[in-house]
Amino acid sequence: MLFRSEAPKASAKQQTLFATLSDADLLTYGVPAEWLLDVRQATEDTLLTLVDHLPGEAAEALLELATGGKPRLLQPVATVVNPFDHPDAQRRFRVLSNVEELQRALEFPWEKWTVFLHPEQRQWVERDYSGPARVSGSAGTGKTIVALHRAVFLARTNPNARVLLATFSDTLSNALRTKLKRLVSHEPRLAERIDVYAMNAIGTRLYKSHFGQVNLATREIILELLSVASKEVGKYKFSLHFLYTEWEQVVDAWQLDSWEAYRDVARLGRKTRLPEQQRTVLWSIFERVRSGLAAQKLITYSGLFSRLASVLANSKNPPFDFAVVDEAQDLSISHLRFFAALGANRPNALFFAGDLGQRIFQQPFSWKALGVDIRGRSRTLRVNYRTSHQIRMQADRLLGPQVSDADGNVDDRRDTVSVFNGPPPVIHVLKSEKEEIKTVSAWLSEQLKTGVAPHECGVFVRSEAELPRARAAVEDAGVPFKVLDEHVETTSGLASISTMYLAKGLEFRAVAVMACDDEIIPLQQRIETVGDDADLQEVYDTERHLLYVACTRARDYLLVTSVSPASEFLDDLRL
C-alpha cells in the first residue's frame, strides 16, 4: 500500500486559488490525479507547502498561475519519441547514455575541460524563464559553467542584445573572462556583446556615466567618523568593531536614512538583540557618520548601487537586456536591488548561479523582500561531474547536509551524485613545517610522474602569511610555478600557488591545501576581533566555507596538510 503525506488544509475564510480550473487542465499541467482535491483547496498560505509534494512541472505551473501568469499547457508527446527524452522525464531519471561523452570530456585538454557543459545541464541553459531564475548546487556541479553558457546562449539567440555576465570580485571576473574567451574564441562579434564585470566594477562604470566622478568612502574614513561620533554621543560604550559591523551590515547595507527605519529594520545576521534605548544612542552615532560622509561628498558602494537602482527603476532603456550573475550567494543587499531594477521582472532578464555553502562575504537576507522572487524558477544541480566522489564526500563533511537562505530555499547536499571515482583525499598532520614541505613536495612529484601537468596542480593556503610554506614545497619538487594575484590568470606549464580567498572559480586536477594549523584556520585574528560572542558562529561558518572552497578546487587528487596542532576542521574532514 502507498501512503502520502497530507497536504495542509485551507482555512475556511481564505480564498482558494485553483477552484475554477477543470480537472483536465490540472492534469495537463502535470498534477497527479490523487492530488487534485488538495490542489483545489490550496490557498496562498498552503501553496508553498503543497508544491513541495508535487512533480516539478506541476509546481512551476501552479506557482505561475498563482502569481497571475498563464503557463503553457503541455502537449501529448508522439509515441515514436523516446519518453526519456522529454524534459519532465529528465527531471526524475538520469539516463547515462552520455557516459562516453563524459569520459571523452575528462580526457580533453585542460583548457577545453574547464568550459565543458554536461549535456544534462543544457536544459537549464536554454530554458525560457518567466522571471528571475537561479541554479544552485554544491561545488563541482557546474554552476559557473551553466552561467557562462547561459550568457552565451542569450547573446546568440538575441542578436541585438547586450548581456552582463557579473560575479563577485575582480578575481572571479578575470577567471570568467578567460573561460569566455575559450568558449567563443571563434565568435568575436558575439563576445563583444557580453560584458564580463566584477560587481563593484560595473557599478562604478554605470555610476560615472550617470552621475560623474565616484568618491568612495574608505574603511579608514568610516572608522574615523564612527570613533569621533561615538565619543561625541557618549552614554553607552560600544566597541569600534561592533559599531563598524552594525554600520556595514545594517545601516549602510539597507541604506537607512531615519531613526524610524533603523528602529524597525529586521537585523538579519546580527545576533545580538538591542533594546530601543541602545538603538536610539546608536542612531545618534550613525546619523553623525552619514552627515560626515555627505559633508565630504563621499559615497559607499551600498549607496552607489542604491542610487543606480533608483535610476534604473525609472528608465525605459536599461544598459543591459540580460544579466547573468555567478557566485550569487555573495551578493549584497544593494547589489540585489540593482539587479531587481535592471531586470524589472522581464522574462529571462535575470539568471543567478551560486552555492549557499560557499558564502564567504555577505550576511544572509531575503531576496523576495527586495523584489527578486525565484519561487518555481530555482533549480539545484545534483550531478557533480567536476569533483570525484571521494573528494566531494569528504569536503561535504565540512558543511551540514542542508544549507538554506533567508527565504527558506533549501539546498540539500545529500542528493548530489558524483559521476566518477578517484583516490581518497590524503590528510597529514606533521611535526614541523620542514616535514610538511617535504611531504607536499613528494606528493607533487608523484602527481607529475602519473601524468598530471604542472598547470593542472594548485597549492592553497589560508592567507599571505603562509605563502612561503607553499612556495618552498613547490620549489623543492622542482615544479615551475606562479603565485596568483587578483587577476587569477593561470599559465600553461606552471603550477598555481594561491590564498584560499582567490580560489573561487579555479579548478585543478591535483590540489594541495597546506598550513591547516590551529589558529590559522579558523584564523585566530578574526576570532579575537569579534566584538560580540554571538557573531563567533559567523566567523566559524565563513572559515569552514573557505576550507571547503579550497578542497573542492580538486578534480582528481587532494592532499590536506598541517603542522601539529592541526585545525579542528580537519577532524570533520576525515571520514
Kindly label every feature range from the protein language model.
Residues 1, 16, 21-34, 177-251, ...:
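Conserved P-loop NTPase-based nucleic-acid remodeling module centered on helicase motor cores
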Residues 3, 11, 37-57, 209-278:
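ATP-hydrolysis module of ASCE/P-loop NTPase motor domains
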Residues 3-103:
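N-terminal accessory nucleic-acid engagement/regulatory domains that precede
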Residues 91-94, 252-261, 400-409:
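Proline-centered turn/helix-capping motifs that create local helix->coil transitions or kinks
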Residues 96-118:
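N-terminal pre-Walker A segment at the start of P-loop NTPase domains
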Residues 110, 114, 118-162, 168-216, ...:
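Conserved helicase motor core of SF1/SF2 NTP-dependent helicases
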Residues 228, 557-558:
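Catalytic/regulatory signature loops of cyclic-dinucleotide turnover enzymes
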